[in-house]
């Protein structure tokens, strides 16, 4: 069964969040899986593990409490957000592999633009070397005991929810954003974690191009 890919454009977060929940509650064994690709106006979203003290200074940017895993993150213009709505039972893999496949899709998307993405154990999402994001060298050596992200910038965030073996929420890839709002939070609960985007590391890519590539990679890697 093919994945139904939908380009939603720029849409408010709250109605999209509600639509994901409604889709998941209403779907049955015959419902095709879907990828919703969109962009949101500026908003902070809190995951179930989120702590209020990680919201340092949200200012006028709204904060939405959600039921996804993880902690606080920021969505805004210039970021590609993809919500995979996948029946894991039908797909034939479990949550851990699902997360791995999403991360692999981001890594392959970055590779399309010549950038090397990295995983950090225990910290879902994808990171790049800030000193040389195009280096193919693997991360090596022990991580710094007090700063496992030293030298890295987070370029993609991941947060999911699984209900009746069906997924919603998803992944956000930073393309060309105003990164200042990330400085007002501890991204994903980590104080001082640097956040970056493709533009900052020297990649000139349009939102539409990045969205198209990421959508294609997810459709490929999330297939059964």
UniProtKB/Swiss-Prot annotation:
BPL/LPL catalytic domain spans which residues? 29-224
Provide GO CC annotations from the record. cytoplasm
**What is the active site of this protein?**
188 (acyl-thioester intermediate)
Pathway per its UniProt entry is: Protein modification; protein lipoylation via endogenous pathway; protein N(6)-(lipoyl)lysine from octanoyl-[acyl-carrier-protein]: step 1/2
Binding positions (substrate): 68-75, 157-159, 170-172
EC supergroup of this enzyme: transferase
GO biological process terms, semicolon-separated: protein modification process
Reactions listed under catalytic activity: octanoyl-[ACP] + L-lysyl-[protein] = N(6)-octanoyl-L-lysyl-[protein] + holo-[ACP] + H(+)
What keywords tag this UniProt record? Acyltransferase, Cytoplasm, Transferase
Q: What is this protein called?
A: Octanoyltransferase
Q: Which organism is it from?
A: Polaromonas naphthalenivorans (strain CJ2)
Query: Source organism lineage?
Result: Bacteria, Pseudomonadati, Pseudomonadota, Betaproteobacteria, Burkholderiales
Q: Which gene encodes it?
A: lipB
